[in-house]
A protein has these predicted regions:
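Long hydrophobic segments that form regular secondary structure
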Residues: 215-265, 269-273
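Active-site-proximal loop/turn and secondary-structure-junction residues that shape catalytic pockets
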Residues: 48-54, 82-86, 123-129, 154-160, ...
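Conserved, mostly hydrophobic/aromatic
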Residues: 46, 121, 240
Length: 281
């Protein structure tokens, strides 16, 4: 009996503690949260959180949960990771993994296209970098998705970030030249450094990310400097994602000095950071 009382109470306390970061995904509660957060200046990126996917049944449930979000009239932007699409894959079966995940994500992208909902292909661990890039391009090279604009996340704390941006830019330029839609790259610092450090320490491998916050900040600015030009924004819109106001100011200055189209650049941050920023305008 005590357990039946304690667990619901603990859930309520936990939800209250993280309410500025995470909203309740249950249908009625989510609708209220979206209505409270949205205003004329904002667009909400809804990311369905959950434990790591370990089996196909879990992957099916996660994808159905994301599809349910896309079907909502009050949702127009969602994120999904390649690791949510299928059970863990064998690293030596890379091509098969790309084909399998592309097949599983295609119905989700087609649903988003039909619902005019933006999908962002998110990234988590370094080992998913090439997989995510290849799945993203394979999805959007399909004839039915040629005119659909989707996005992908790029983590600046990866040493490969600038090279990956160049690769995406060159691919997007060919896509647009062939009559396809531009794409969007959401540039983030990266949020899994403790996990990457743990993985490196357990295996004895070199750290996959850069070694310090300063290096990550520098890499972030390298990516923005490359991406924020008229010729590059014609193919790849940019999401400047993060709560560092210096990075936001830098992006604004580059837009002004280079005469860029402000509509081609979006600024993304957590609700608590956005609310604080708006309060001090």
């Amino acid at each position: 009996k005590r357990q039946r009382i304690a667990v619901p109470s603990a859930r309520r306390v936990l939800r209250h503690m993280v309410s500025h970061l995470i909203v309740d995904a249950r249908d009625r509660q989510l609708g209220k949260a979206i209505a409270a957060l949205r205003d004329e200046h904002t667009r909400l990126n809804i990311n369905l959180l959950g434990e790591a996917i370990l089996g196909q049944g879990e992957a099916d449930r996660r994808l159905e949960g994301i599809a349910a979000l896309i079907r909502r009239d009050d949702v127009d932007y969602v994120s999904v990771k390649v690791s949510a699409a299928t059970a863990p894959h064998a690293p030596y079966a890379f091509d098969e993994a790309v084909a399998d995940i592309t097949e599983r994500l295609t119905p989700l992208f087609e649903l988003a296209r039909d619902r005019d909902t933006f999908i962002n292909l998110d990234m988590e661990e370094y080992r998913d970098l090439d997989l995510t890039l290849n799945v993203f391009t394979a999805l959007l090279e399909q004839p039915g998705l040629r005119d659909y604009e989707a996005g992908i996340v790029l983590q600046a704390y990866l040493p490969d970030a600038l090279a990956a941006m160049v690769r995406l830019q060159e691919w997007a330029a060919r896509r647009v030249a062939a009559g396809g839609a531009p794409v969007k790259v959401r540039v983030v610092k990266g949020a899994n450094l403790p996990m990457e450090r743990m993985q490196a320490s357990l295996t004895g491998w070199p750290l996959a990310t850069v070694g310090s916050k300063q290096e990550a900040d520098t890499n972030y600015k390298r990516v923005l400097n490359y991406a924020l030009t008229p010729e590059h924004l014609a193919h790849v819109r940019i999401g400047v994602a993060g709560h560092n106001l210096f990075d936001v100011a830098l992006a604004h200055r580059l837009i002004e000095r280079r005469g860029l189209d402000p509509a081609a650049v979006e600024f993304e941050m957590l609700p608590v950071s956005y609310t604080h920023l708006r309060a001090h305008e």
